[in-house]
């Protein structure tokens, strides 16, 4: 980066999915809305799922989602690629295949055209990798840059994966390490090592396509991508939507080492506090240290898939996932709901 270039992250108050409106506030904002009832709407926003799904025919359903955010990287190309990876992930989480996308962009009038071009190029290249066609979009002027995609995909109506189908006995798998939100806070302060910055960028630009392709071969009952609401926020949505509770083996969680160091120092994104406020009443932390809890509330950007799979298929799916996503781990299990707390940290 040239010395006279403005760091993109300095133009944003929040980074990536850390800019999301809190889940509790969002629920209040959407409450009482008049929504048209349609029997072909297979998935709406009533259970806070990753995307909407609309049945078109007996063997075809549309999957639609939208995601955009302010810069999470100073390199404009990397920012564009991360934003596209994150937006496409919602379709993969539903078991679908993304096919079409539209750009959503806001840029300062003073931003060099070369910078804007690089943001778009990052998005286009990642969409190309995913087999997705970007057919247009919409752009506005704004003091804070933002970029993302509205994505349309397809899935068989009988093979839709939601966040509300987890069953007691299911094994919970997860595909990516945790700590991206903490790292991006540290990156804004220039206190993250170069190798860890590269690791973060690599994780955030890794499509969930391979994980999706693996999981649809097995008896997966529920899936969600873990992004802005953090691991515990998204798992809470799964537990509540499925009417179950989740026991999380914290020793199995793959925390990024430098994120652990920063969390212990108190380098935390604002989104972590919003996520904690939303999910904490439903979480039994046991005797786990505060830094570990903070990381489990940490907002992830382009995070991995949390997969609730039939126990008979768990080992085979985990082995296949590790063949394409080496960081895949067995995080815990789903239990019958006994009332009270929804998530227990073991």
Question: For each of these PLM feature ranges, what is it?
Answer:
Residues 1-346:
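Helix-biased detector of long, well-ordered alpha-helical tracts
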């Amino acid at each position: 980066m040239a010395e006279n270039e403005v760091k993109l992250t300095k133009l944003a108050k929040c980074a990536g999915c850390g800019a999301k409106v809190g889940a509790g506030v969002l629920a209040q904002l959407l409450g009482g809305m008049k929504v048209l009832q349609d029997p072909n709407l297979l998935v709406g926003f009533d259970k806070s799922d990753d995307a909407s799904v609309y049945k078109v025919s007996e063997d075809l359903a549309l999957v639609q989602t939208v995601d955009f955010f302010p810069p999470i990287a100073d390199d404009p190309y990397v920012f564009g690629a991360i934003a596209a990876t994150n937006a496409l992930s919602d379709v993969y989480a539903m078991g679908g295949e993304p096919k079409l996308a539209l750009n959503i962009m806001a840029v300062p009038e003073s931003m060099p055209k070369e910078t804007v071009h690089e943001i778009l190029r990052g998005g286009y290249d990642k969409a190309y990798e995913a087999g997705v066609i970007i057919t247009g979009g919409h752009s506005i002027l704004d003091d804070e840059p933002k970029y993302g995609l509205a994505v349309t995909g397809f899935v068989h109506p009988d093979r839709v994966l939601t966040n509300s189908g987890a069953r007691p006995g299911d094994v919970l798998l997860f595909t990516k390490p945790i700590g991206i939100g903490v790292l991006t806070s540290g990156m804004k302060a220039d206190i993250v090592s170069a190798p860890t910055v590269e690791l973060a960028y690599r994780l955030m630009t890794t499509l969930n396509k391979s994980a999706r392709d693996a999981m649809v071969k097995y008896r997966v009952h529920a899936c969600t991508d873990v992004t802005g609401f953090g691991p515990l926020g998204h798992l809470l949505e799964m537990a509540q939507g499925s009417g179950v509770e989740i026991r999380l083996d914290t020793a199995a969680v793959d925390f990024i080492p430098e994120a652990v160091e920063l969390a212990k120092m108190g380098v935390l994104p604002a989104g972590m506090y919003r996520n904690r406020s939303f999910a904490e009443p439903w979480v039994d932390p046991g005797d786990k240290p505060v830094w570990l809890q903070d990381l489990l509330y940490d907002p992830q950007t382009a995070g991995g898939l949390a997969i609730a799979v039939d126990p008979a298929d768990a080992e085979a799916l985990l082995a296949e996932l590790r063949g394409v996503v080496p960081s895949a781990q067995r995080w815990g299990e789903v239990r019958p709901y006994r009332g009270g707390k929804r998530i227990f940290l073991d």
